[in-house]
Amino acid sequence: MKKTLLTAILLGASVAASAQELTFAMQPSYPPFETTNAKGEIIGFDVDVTNAICQEIQATCKFKSETFDALIPNLKAKRFDAAISAIDITDARAKQVLFSDAYYDSSASYVALKGKATLESAKNIGVQNGTTFQQYTVAETKQYSPKSYASLQNAILDLKSGRIDIIFGDTAVLADMISKEPEIQFIGEKVTNKKYFGNGLGIAMHKSNKDLAAQLNKGLAAIKANGEYQKIYDKWITK
């Protein structure tokens, strides 16, 4: 009996010692992917997906707030283990960091105030700083004068005040915005230019962290197979 108890204690200690604690960085001002609740806790689609993956690989997840344009530089400096913040997988980013398999299929859209600007009449466009949406706007839509924002919430304020005519961003994020701002509507068609977006969103890691990438991919495949991913998707994206 004593031997059995000792074995159980040692086994438990071994599991606890080997359990990973992983820190994921994100900018929590991008609902429905990441935001904060009334208690100041980071919540959202990315958080739930990460927690589900960590449960599958028997790791403990921690989340920390970072500005979006600092995610990749700080990841390269190994200040955290991974970044999950609705990051589009692009060739340019893949040269700097290692990506997991895509966990979400992304697209981009335009929004404007109802009855105001169209894609043809708009002159000033708002985008989030450091994103592929900013890169696309600067390179591909030279008919617009771009204005960058730390968050889309700031862009909304300028849209309402008339400082910008339209906003360009992730379709799901803009849909969440419209659900809270009834005077805003989608205009034009979705954009899926694979040079900038359309390859999906991925979890970013340091280039050398191939073991972690393999673990996260294994966990992602598991939650897609067991239905947990769909539950999370329905909770945050399907409304």
From Swiss-Prot:
GO terms for biological process: amino acid transport. InterPro entries: Lys_Arg_Orn-bd, SBP_3_CS, Solute-binding_3/MltF_N. PROSITE patterns: SBP_BACTERIAL_3. The complex is composed of two ATP-binding proteins (ArtP), two transmembrane proteins (ArtM and ArtQ) and a solute-binding protein (ArtI). Belongs to the bacterial solute-binding protein 3 family. Part of the ABC transporter complex ArtPIQM involved in arginine transport. This is ABC transporter arginine-binding protein. It comes from Haemophilus influenzae (strain ATCC 51907 / DSM 11121 / KW20 / Rd).
